[in-house]
Regions:
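ANL superfamily adenylate-forming
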Residues: 108-149, 256, 319-320
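AMP-binding/adenylate-forming catalytic domain of the ANL superfamily
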Residues: 470-494, 509-532
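Conserved AMP-binding/adenylate-forming core of the ANL superfamily
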Residues: 16-62, 66, 70, 87-92, ...
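Conserved AMP-binding A3 loop
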Residues: 28-30, 153-177
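Conserved pre-ATP/AMP-binding loop-to-beta segment of ANL
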Residues: 139-157, 164, 187-193
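AMP-binding/adenylate-forming catalytic core of the ANL superfamily
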Residues: 65, 86, 103, 356-364, ...
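Conserved AMP-binding/adenylation subdomain of ANL enzymes
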Residues: 76, 176-193, 201-240, 255
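Gly/Ser/Thr-rich phosphate-binding loop
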Residues: 236-244, 253-326
Length: 532
């Protein structure tokens, strides 16, 4: 297997097959990589040789971003993917923490830099005449270095769902490793077209999208994700493969279904964090196979599904993946299920997903030894994700380590409750999280987004919960907020910390309440003991 991005790209330098499709234009691999080589040569020529050659990208999902990625690979310097949804001092902080000496942006994002202190950072607008002149004047590419597999290719910031984003050092070897695996798994060839609509500054797009195209020679169709525009794009570009992360499938399924939705070229959708129901429904509606797994930006834990995967499970882990009690640093016993399928031993079975073999491919967080140390303890990698595993090794997610709820003296996690709520047909998206209980501990709160044209009454919701034999009475949401949308990261991951901080102070939608020991829901403020 090819060991670096640099080697992968060099193999395609003379390839006349299509590489990039965007709008009405098509670039061959030869054209795409020739442009990338000039791009890299220009940046290396103007770089400060006394500083790390870190090039930031504040760019959208466009050919310019693909060129910047290829240029970094060919040129042997480090690319820093800057989150385009960050603003103000948070944005400046990311650029600074990544030690960017050069920042590439475009007309769509240039204004985000206005007023920011970016001293020591040279900014180029790739849509400007200045950049065209700099790039055109570049000579032949002499790489900054010939990279080794373990060298850093990109700094990619985590999504920030549970705290401030951290810059993960992504090694060159991770890209060909991921790409070769997915190419083999899904039989991707140069005749395929990879639809890249997830943010290219994020690991999902890099590992589950870009890597697939590089490893197979397939064409890439970069796009900004649009639920209503997805089908038209698939048909326009002849896209046969797409990657996703977070809730895009739910957004697409919320759009009205057409009689010919399955008339499209899509063959495979691969990603993570989709709801079980959405996986099946997307596959049915669009005539494609959906493979959903588990992964993280750090790349230290890999869990994959196969055809035998039971409902609710994300799959089995690679060797070394286990569930550990983080306090005792011992492996948790297998999950035990009662007669109706409910987890009977949550306090013992739920633990943190770890890699007992160590860091795996995780290269640490750039310039953040403390955060790296929190992940690497006792010779193992601790993921921060809660889960339990059955006797056959199938893993079921339970939430993040910060999502434990203490309800009436019982420990609960959020993911199992969310999986049950997803069974209710009107619900399109759901988030379960903790809010303070007026007496002691936590109260369960659920935020719901309904499907297009769907309706839900307090009576219907309560009746549904009562009919779920595997839902503990203590797991019934005390508060239910029905809203039009939920706060998400740039990668469509729900920001539960924002929801928890908001609590009951909602300014839109409908808020329901249930008495502490009752089963009936009513509008908040209209029933007895709303805070009891």
């Amino acid at each position: 297997m090819t060991g670096t991005v640099q080697q992968l790209l060099q193999m395609r330098i003379d390839d006349p097959a299509p590489a990039v499709k965007y709008g009405d234009r098509v670039w061959t691999w030869r054209e795409h990589l020739d442009e990338a080589a000039h791009h890299a040569a220009a940046l290396i020529a103007v770089a400060d040789v006394d500083r790390p050659l870190h090039v930031g990208t504040l760019l959208g999902n466009t050919p310019a971003m693909l060129t910047a990625m290829a240029a970094a690979g060919l040129g042997g310097y480090v690319l820093c993917g800057i989150n385009t949804t960050r603003r103000g001092e948070a944005l400046a902080g990311d650029i600074g923490r990544a030690d960017c000496q050069i920042l590439l942006t475009d007309q769509a994002h240039r204004g985000l830099l206005d007023g920011l202190d970016l001293s020591g950072v040279r900014v180029f607008d790739v849509d400007s005449a200045q950049w065209a002149q700099v790039s055109a004047g570049a000579g032949e590419l002499i790489p900054h270095r010939t990279v080794e597999p373990g060298d850093t290719f990109m700094l990619i910031f985590t999504s920030g769902t549970s705290g401030e984003p951290k810059a993960v050092q992504v090694a060159h070897m991770m890209v060909p490793f991921a790409g070769a695996s997915l190419v083999q798994r899904f039989s991707i060839t140069a005749a395929d077209v990879c639809y890249l609509s997830m943010p290219l500054f994020h690991s999902n797009a890099l590992m589950a999208g870009w890597s697939v195209a590089l490893s197979s020679g397939a064409a890439m169709a970069p796009a900004t994700f649009s639920a209503s525009g997805l089908l038209d794009d698939l048909r326009r570009y002849g896209a046969t493969y797409m990657n996703y992360v977070g809730k895009p499938l739910a957004y697409v399924l919320a759009t009205p279904e057409g009689p010919d939705d399955a008339d499209n070229p899509l063959r495979v959708a691969f990603g993570n964090e989709a709801a079980e129901r959405d996986i099946a429904e997307f596959g049915r509606r669009f005539g494609a196979t959906v493979w959903d797994g588990f992964g993280s930006t750090e790349g230290a834990v890999i869990i994959t599904r196969d055809g035998q995967c039971p409902t609710g499970s994300v799959g089995r882990g690679f060797p070394g993946v286990a569930i550990y009690n983080p306090d005792t640093v011992t492996e948790c016993p297998p999950a035990v299920f009662d007669a109706v399928g409910a987890l009977a031993n949550p306090d013992e079975a739920i633990g943190e997903i770890v890699n007992t073999d160590g860091a795996g491919m995780f290269g640490g967080y750039y310039n953040d030894a403390q955060a790296t140390g929190e992940r690497l303890r006792h010779g193992m990698y601790f993921s921060g994700d809660l889960a339990y595993r059955d006797a056959d090794g199938w893993i079921y997610l339970a939430g993040r380590t910060g999502e434990w709820l203490r309800v009436d003296g019982e420990n609960l996690t959020t993911a199992p409750i969310e999986r049950i709520l997803h069974r209710l047909a009107p619900i399109n998206r759901v988030a379960v999280y903790a809010v303070p209980d007026p007496q002691v501990g936590d109260a369960v709160m659920a935020a719901l987004v309904l499907g297009d044209g769907a309706a839900l009454t307090p009576q219907d919701f309560g009746d549904f919960l009562a009919a779920q034999p595997d839902l503990s009475p203590k797991a019934w949401p005390r508060y239910v907020w029905i809203t039009d949308d939920l706060p998400v990261t740039a990668t469509n991951k729900i920001l539960k910390r924002t929801l928890s901080a908001q609590g009951l102070e909602v300014t839109s939608g409908v808020l329901w309440h249930r008495e502490a020991r009752g089963g009936r829901y009513h509008p908040f403020g209209s029933g007895p003991s709303d805070l009891a």
